[in-house]
């Protein structure tokens, strides 16, 4: 797999595509492109998270960490139209797609924000989140992934939780142990076809 999806400015030539997200309650057609995560299909881990995660809070601030072209963020926004949904990613091409897809879907409660580095220090973003969903960029390596999660999980509001989906053979069990050793409550919430959804809280 190309590492370009976690680059700020992907170097791959543009190859526009379309991915359909068809759930029992939400149908979306999302523009994709080369240089972003899973441009040719809805990633199976993302699909698992969409299928099994409990409903988002009806209001408040909700985060899609590593939003890509916006599949998680737009489903969150569709399911919680009164919530403010934030999609963040380091990849500028992905953020442009997320914005375009939110606009085409008429989801005015989505904000797609390009961030730098691993931390959430950005005055455009809220200080606390009532829910975090993420299919995190495992392939950036453990040190960078741990720094990324350590920075963003601390922004969970009291009693809020995060749902992270990780492929088992890419380290879901070791990530769960790291979270627990770092002082977080981390439990396997669901599993399917080699993917694990972890529920993480304080």
Which residues does each PLM region occupy?
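Conserved beta-strand signature within the Rossmann-like core of class I S-adenosyl-L-methionine
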Residues: 159-166
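Well-ordered beta-strand scaffold positions
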Residues: 26-28
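Short "lid" loop at the C-terminus of a central beta-strand within the Rossmann-like core
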Residues: 138-140, 167-172
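A short glycine-rich, Lys/Arg-flanked "PGG" loop and its adjoining helix->strand segment in the class I
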Residues: 146-158
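Conserved SAM/SAH cofactor-binding pocket of Class I
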Residues: 44-125, 131-134, 145
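N-terminal auxiliary segments of SAM/dcSAM-dependent transferases
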Residues: 1-24, 34-35, 39
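General small-molecule cofactor/ligand-binding pocket signal
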Residues: 31, 111-113, 187-189
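Class I S-adenosyl-L-methionine
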Residues: 3-15, 171-202
């Amino acid at each position: 797999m190309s590492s370009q999806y976690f680059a700020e400015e992907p170097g791959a030539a543009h190859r526009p595509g379309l991915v359909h997200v068809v759930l029992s309650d939400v149908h979306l057609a999302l523009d994709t492109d080369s240089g972003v995560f899973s441009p040719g299909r809805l990633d199976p881990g993302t699909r698992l998270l969409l299928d099994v995660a409990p409903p988002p809070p009806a209001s408040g601030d909700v985060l899609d960490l590593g939003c890509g072209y916006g599949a998680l963020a737009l489903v969150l926004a569709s399911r919680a139209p009164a919530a403010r949904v934030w999609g963040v990613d380091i990849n500028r091409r992905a953020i442009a797609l997320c914005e375009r897809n939110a606009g085409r879907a008429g989801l005015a409660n989505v904000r797609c924000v390009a961030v730098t580095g691993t931390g959430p220090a950005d005055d455009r973003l809220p200080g606390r989140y009532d829910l975090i969903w993420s299919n995190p960029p495992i392939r950036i390596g453990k040190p960078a992934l741990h720094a990324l999660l350590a920075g963003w999980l601390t922004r969970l509001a009291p009693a809020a939780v995060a749902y992270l989906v990780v492929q088992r053979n890419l380290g879901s069990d070791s990530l769960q142990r790291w979270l627990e050793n770092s002082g977080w409550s981390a439990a396997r919430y669901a599993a399917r076809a080699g993917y694990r959804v972890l529920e993480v809280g304080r």
